[in-house]
Swiss-Prot record:
One of its GO terms (cellular component) is cytosol. This is Ribosomal protein L11 methyltransferase. S-adenosyl-L-methionine binds at residues 145, 166, 188, 230. Gene3D superfamilies: Vaccinia Virus protein VP39 (3.40.50.150). It catalyses: L-lysyl-[protein] + 3 S-adenosyl-L-methionine = N(6),N(6),N(6)-trimethyl-L-lysyl-[protein] + 3 S-adenosyl-L-homocysteine + 3 H(+). It comes from Pasteurella multocida (strain Pm70). Its EC number is 2.1.1.-. The gene is prmA. Keywords: Cytoplasm, Methyltransferase, S-adenosyl-L-methionine, Transferase.
């Protein structure tokens, strides 16, 4: 069966609304692509993280009257005079297989690999975390997750306790446990994140060492040797008192989900309690690390 695809260049503020509307008018699937043609698979819990230049790609049945679709989009003001869009017929494919073929094991630091479950692990002697991409939360494909994974790989986690604040898929907590941590705690505001983290921990054989809490249910006296938070700059600054209290004396902290342009304001908030290391940047994102003084 053939399909017709419409690809519309959009802004991050319109993309989600446009996606919902395309589904309403008959699209069988809608995906987001960044300007480099990369699928956007890694939202933070509770949101779809989109870049300023986002393409919305919708598939329709081959019999669809695409002029009618365009007219509806114009009527809803998702297409205006300056809009850039492209319509093309595409061949039928095994979409699931093609999607799976795009994902390969990824290495972070010296020891750590994140591997899709359908791939062979490249090094059986390495620290391998089995995690499937494209589910709801982070799987290592985004620079902020990669920065956090590399930081965890650089630490001596043997017999340490770890808190993953804003755990999403649980990838950071699970990686820490695989890297030698004694125990870990995942905290999130989203019940789906708690469920995803639990399932992923079971898949990796570490569920007995991972505790999971919704934010409002976390123990008041909870502390750890290592705290990592891959959320956003605004919440990191707002939650400084909460996050600071999670770190044991002489414990270390890793923060990401921060644009490089936001680093100084986040550093200002945390420098009052932490000795901060140089900011690590990747693409437009960064990681801030430090030790509680």
């Amino acid at each position: 069966m053939a399909w017709i695809q419409i690809r519309i260049n959009s802004t991050n503020t319109q993309a989600e609304q446009m996606s919902d509307y395309l589904a309403e008018i008959g699209a069988v699937s809608v995906t987001f692509m960044d300007s480099q043609d990369t699928p956007i698979f890694e939202p933070l819990p509770g949101e779809t993280r989109l870049w300023g230049n986002t393409d919305v790609v919708a598939l329709f049945d081959a019999e669809t009257d695409m002029q009618q679709i365009v007219d509806l989009l114009k009527e809803a003001q998702y297409l205006v005079e300056s809009s850039v869009y492209k319509i093309e017929q595409i061949e039928d494919k095994d979409w699931e297989r093609e999607w799976m073929d795009n994902f390969h094991p990824m290495r972070f630091g010296k020891r750590l690999w994140i591997c899709p479950s359908w791939r062979e692990v490249p090094d059986e002697n390495a620290t391998n975390v089995m995690l499937d991409p494209g589910l709801a939360f982070g799987t290592g494909t985004h620079p902020t997750t990669a920065l956090c994974l590399e930081w965890l790989d650089s630490l001596d986690l043997q017999d340490k306790t770890v808190i993953d604040f804003g755990c999403g898929s649980g990838i950071l907590a699970i990686a820490a446990l695989k890297l030698g941590a004694k125990s870990a705690v995942g905290i999130d505001i989203d019940p789906q994140a708690i469920l995803a983290s639990r399932n992923n921990a079971e898949q990796n054989g570490v569920a007995d060492r991972l505790q999971l809490f919704l934010s409002e249910d976390k123990p008041a006296d909870l502390k750890a040797d290592v705290v990592v938070a891959n959320i956003l700059a605004g919440p990191l600054k707002e939650l400084y008192p909460v996050i600071r209290q999670l770190v044991k004396p002489n414990g270390v902290l890793g923060l990401s989900g921060i644009l490089a342009t936001q680093a100084s304001s986040v550093c200002d908030a945390y420098a009052q309690s932490f000795v901060l290391e140089p900011v690590e940047e990747r693409e437009e994102w960064c990681r801030i690390t430090g030790k509680l003084q």
